[in-house]
Amino acid sequence: MSQKIRIKLKSYDHMLVDKSAEKIVKTVKSTGAVVTGPIPLPTHKKLFTVLRSPHVNKKAREQFEVMSYKRLIDIYSSSSKTIDALMKLELPSGVEVEIKV
């Protein structure tokens, strides 16, 4: 096949993203394909500010943040064996996987 496969991983837990990326790289390398990555993409931080009191005290506020972590993996010179191995791979439920061929 020898086409480029790009895998993007996204999660709110950086440990899950790193373990998933490591698992994918290990699986792909065992099939003989060339892998670049995992490349860490910028972390997005979303900040929410809410009032502590439901009625008064506008000055009393609380802030919450949600961080999303991303990794990028490129696979070159893949074969049907590589794609079969990726299809059978089980990843944690907290990781969003986007694959582009």
From Swiss-Prot:
Keywords: Ribonucleoprotein, Ribosomal protein. The keyword Ion transport does not apply. GO terms for molecular function: structural constituent of ribosome; tRNA binding. Belongs to the universal ribosomal protein uS10 family. PANTHER family: 30S RIBOSOMAL PROTEIN S10 FAMILY MEMBER. NCBIfam families: PRK00596.1 (NF001861), rpsJ_bact (TIGR01049). HAMAP family: Ribosomal_uS10. Involved in the binding of tRNA to the ribosomes. This is Small ribosomal subunit protein uS10. The lineage of its organism: Bacteria, Pseudomonadati, Bacteroidota, Flavobacteriia, Flavobacteriales. The gene is rpsJ.
